[in-house]
Amino acid sequence: MKPILTFLTALLFPVLIDLSSAEDLTVYPPVPGLAASEHYKVRVRAVADGAVWQGAFAIQTACKSLENGTDGYFDTLAGWTHTYVNFETAGAVEIEIARANGQPIHSAAAHPQRKASSCSVKNGRAFVRLDQPCLVAVDIDGRMDTQDTGKGYNGPPLHTISIFANPPLRGKPMPDDRGVLYVKPGVIPPSDGPWTTLYFLPGVHDIGLAFPLRANRQYYIPGDAMVYGTLSNRKWGDAHHIRIFGLGTLSG
């Protein structure tokens, strides 16, 4: 999973944003109304004297069982989960990964390996150091590295984790900025009107299928917002100068 902006997607992905601590590190609070990962807990801190650990909200997406032939699920992946965290950093950071159930981690490996300056296990927890913003997956206890999980795999569900250490996002709107229409969770926003920016407030949103995008507009999803639905534009000549950004999640 990568934070790539895409229209009409059926994948869950983190879009690109803000909120919390040290000068070079921005960690987001939990998404109101969204359960944290059942499998992992994550903390992060800047690599600097006196830096303190901050809890990073771990979001989980799960594979369902096959319900019909067109939903894109596979029964062999039922119960698999992926956990991910988003934060912003301008410098080096250290990430701590622990199992949510308190059981110890025995081994860990970051991929791509070249992106992590170190990856180790201490006292049953994994520690990853990143010297600059990057995206890495961390294989816990060799679940993906030491076995073939391709076609024919019939073992227990696997639970993977990724770290999205994004560069600082500039130009974030504020809910009270001129031209900004803020959207509360549970409210379907208007697809048009006297606004230039839709700002999804912290929480869980559902915009339904094919929410219309408009030219010369931007759509902002902060790191503590989850937006379910898809975005589309079917109006000829209206699909230009559209920006979707923030480090929240758009799940189609």
Where are the regions a protein language model picked out?
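Beta-strand-enriched, solvent-exposed domains that form extended recognition/catalytic surfaces
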Residues: 23-179
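Positively charged n-region of N-terminal signal peptides that target proteins for export
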Residues: 1-4
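N-terminal domain-start segments of secreted/luminal proteins
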Residues: 167-217
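Bacterial N-terminal signal peptides
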Residues: 6-18
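Structural motif
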Residues: 135-137, 196-198, 218, 225
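Short hydrophobic beta-strand that contains or immediately precedes a catalytic carboxylate
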Residues: 199-200, 220-221, 231
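A mature extracytoplasmic/lumenal domain signature
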Residues: 142, 202-204, 223-225, 248
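Extracellular beta-strand-rich solenoid/capping regions of secreted or surface-exposed proteins
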Residues: 128-130, 190-193, 205-218, 226-245, ...
